[in-house]
């Protein structure tokens, strides 16, 4: 079992984030112990949290992550959509870079003609 402090330290997240996941029901503590009802998480919960963090890093929204976690058969479709969105973003960035490169080349050519 891991405490909130251990999980936050090991996975680089804040207590606020972990408590938020509990509040919205995406990741509940395995047990609550002692008078303070301290939250503790077993290895399965830690693995689930690692998935949540990876999915967020990949651009999934929490509702999408909830669907993936509750309906594993939905994972492929959701991840395919995320890949499509990321590819669209890459294409947009590439077009912007190409436009900037053209503007720089035009600017350089214009500077050369004035000499």
Indicate residue ranges for each PLM-predicted region.
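Basic helix-turn-helix/winged-helix DNA-binding cores
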Residues: 1-63
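Short, charged amphipathic alpha-helical surface segments
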Residues: 53, 65-115
């Amino acid at each position: 079992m891991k405490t909130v402090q251990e999980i936050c330290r090991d996975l680089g997240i804040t207590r606020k984030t972990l408590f938020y996941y509990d509040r919205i029901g995406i990741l509940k503590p395995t047990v609550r112990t002692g008078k303070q009802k301290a939250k503790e998480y077993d290895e399965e919960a830690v693995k689930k949290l690692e998935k949540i963090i990876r999915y967020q890093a990949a651009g999934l929204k929490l509702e999408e992550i909830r669907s993936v976690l509750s309906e594993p058969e939905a994972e492929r479709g959701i991840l395919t959509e995320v890949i499509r969105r990321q590819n669209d973003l890459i294409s947009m960035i590439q077009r912007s870079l190409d436009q900037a490169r053209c503007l720089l080349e035009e600017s350089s050519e214009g500077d050369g003609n004035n000499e």
